[in-house]
């Protein structure tokens, strides 16, 4: 028998009927065999073996969210290391790309059935997946979704003022290689109403409503795939981290703080034992 805590190679290569997870929850040990696992678990084992070695797993909807969270974890880990606290690795955390919204619920549910602590992080613009997400939630999966009707790009843009939108467009230029390309992306959204520049304050001075500017930029970023790979997600995450305390991003940060709380759970301080303390009568 081989017991591993860190080697995904063993998880990948072993016959699945020979695999089992072992969880210790407050002294109660639970062993769950993967024998007879369905096709979904087989795919998870092959594509994301590290998830089966984790204590806590965040299933992110896609590459954008995956990269965004990786960048956030790097920043949070750095600060926690400076503070002398545990990192995400120390907490046994794995971030998994769910490969799309329809996969998030079933994947999170399958991992939860193995006894793992699981969170699902996804968009909130597709009602067709609500049932599978609710099913996962009933098993104890922590579900973190953006505001109703929003995807990642829409959530971020929803609170930005003109200067914040212009700053986001500058990030788009870095990823799309030129200002002209980003301008073409924007004008492809509303070809009958082109914008003259990447300065959103100029748009507004010419009559564009702020909400319309937010929607156009969010749609362009989504449809032209500015952040639709892990590197793009990381770039977006880095931009959020640099502006984390700005009020314009408060609605986005509120959801990221939920993920942070899941990744680094608070534990009771056992340094002070007052069980024998006597009170004055």
Task: Describe each model-derived feature in a short phrase.
Residues 1-50, 250-257, 261-281:
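Switch/communication elements of ASCE P-loop NTPase nucleotide-binding domains
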Residues 47-59, 63-281:
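Acidic, Mg2+-coordinating catalytic modules of nucleic-acid enzymes
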